[in-house]
Amino acid sequence: MGKLAVAAITSLWVIPMSIIVNHIVPEPYMDEIFHVPQAQQYCNGNFRSWDPMITTPPGLYYLSLAHVASLFPGMLLMENTSQSFSEACSTSVLRSTNAVSAVLCGVLVYEIIRFLGPNLSDRKATFMALVMSLYPLHWFFTFLYYTDVASLTAVLAMYLTCLKRRYVLSALFGTLAVFIRQTNVVWMLFVACSGILDFTLDSSKQKGKQEVNQELHQSSNKKGATLRSNLRKRKSDISSDTSDPFNHGQTVPSTEDTSDLVYDIYTVISTSWNLKWRILIKFSPFIFVVVAFGIFILWNGGIVLGAKEAHVVSLHFAQIMYFSLVSALFTAPLHFSVNQLRHQFHQLHRNWSLSLILTLVALVAGFVSVHFFSLAHPYLLADNRHYPFYLWRKIINAHWLMKYILVPVYVYSWFSILTLLAKTRRQTWILVYFLATCGVLVPTPLIEFRYYTIPFYLFMLHSCVRSSSFATWLLIGTIFVSINVFTMAMFLFRPFKWSHEDGVQRFIW
């Protein structure tokens, strides 16, 4: 019932907003001026045609072909004309590819929430999925022909099927995700690693449980009451942990105990070595895709397809700082509540010496990142249609001290994200998540909030299964809706013109 409710309610805002956007902005805008004509070339059967300004693979265009093909018979009946297939690939129809993807994405979010939090009520899981469907960056680009919505949908489908241990299907969704946006290969590696963590830690616990059972059996003939009691206690501890290798919905040791991380890494490495052939077989579909992608990079001479001079891989470590703050601000009730501030202080107080060292290291890393690895891409400085343009000019670059003043806020935001994840995730999983986020964001020279969507969703999916009252989620949803109303109103009803270029310009993320 929850899936149907999510799909139906999501459609209630997707359909009317799509109609409004297509009515007011019928022509391709911004990046659509590249994507729409390219998709229309595919609709015409010109699969060898390629716009050299497009940086991403053609996965979205093939999805659109399938989407238009599914609509085409109905369009012929409704219009009662001999409209050709290529004529059916209008801007509005191509945009509807993302509208359908957004509905599917909401259902996937619901399914993942239910899997990670089986004790959650259907009502609360439905509400959480609906709130996450309103995430401003995801919601806004639902109504335009960009790759973001389809990319997120494919990644979530890959993750859900991996959680369910359907690895071949997961790798197929991963292939689609990479074919839509090539940086998704990093998220494919993340999903594969999370699957390996699941598999190896579960295997090691099952082995430990079998050893305890054997010891219990041997001790039964020795009348060792104390030994049997201790073994039963050990068995109980292992059994309670084996039911879920990631302790979904249960608090795991906090980040102050680094021995847990070291032990888990040792367990994963040793178990992986012992099970290396089984792991290679189970996860071989992921390996094939990653190897094929590596061959593509060698053949292509880089990761992007077109406009390579404007998308040079850079060391932009400040990008992960921006991600933490943007994510924390979007979900301020989670990060800046009295309870969360108290929890953060309690975590620091429990092991103040280690916490002090970690805080100092994080602050130093933050200062180094913003001082030496803070980039201002020419696109960022020249295009006042994007909100990051104003963020950079009015806040980050308003004064030379400002970027340093923000470092403690960045660090707090990351600590808050990690402590929320630590309530439901093992530290090895958190480490892999952090590395994947860095792998996607650090090489990217351009500040684009759209790039934060996938790591944001993964954080929210794993923090929501423990936290948060209904009121907290209602407040987050209110923030999302308020931002969406503002950004869409600015996009639709506050157009402006440039003196040096014809056409109407609009504010966009």
UniProtKB/Swiss-Prot annotation:
Keywords: Endoplasmic reticulum, Glycoprotein, Glycosyltransferase, Membrane, Transferase, Transmembrane, Transmembrane helix. Belongs to the ALG10 glucosyltransferase family. Its main location: endoplasmic reticulum. Residues 1-4, 79-99, 146-170, 307-311, 377-400, 450-472 are cytoplasmic. Pathway: Protein modification; protein glycosylation. InterPro entries: Alg10. The chain crosses the membrane at residues 5-25, 58-78, 100-120, 125-145, 171-191, 286-306, 312-332, 356-376, 401-421, 429-449, 473-493. Residues 26-57, 121-124, 192-285, 333-355, 422-428, 494-509 are lumenal. It comes from the Eukaryota. Dol-P-Glc:Glc(2)Man(9)GlcNAc(2)-PP-Dol alpha-1,2-glucosyltransferase that operates in the biosynthetic pathway of dolichol-linked oligosaccharides, the glycan precursors employed in protein asparagine (N)-glycosylation. The assembly of dolichol-linked oligosaccharides begins on the cytosolic side of the endoplasmic reticulum membrane and finishes in its lumen. The sequential addition of sugars to dolichol pyrophosphate produces dolichol-linked oligosaccharides containing fourteen sugars, including two GlcNAcs, nine mannoses and three glucoses. It is found in: Endoplasmic reticulum membrane. Residues 210-254 are annotated as: Disordered. It is a multi-pass membrane protein. Its EC number is 2.4.1.256. Disruption phenotype: Small plants with reduced leaf size. Hypoglycosylation of glycoproteins leading to ER stress and activation of the unfolded protein response (UPR). Increased sensitivity to salt stress. The keyword Plastid does not apply. The gene is ALG10. This is Dol-P-Glc:Glc(2)Man(9)GlcNAc(2)-PP-Dol alpha-1,2-glucosyltransferase.
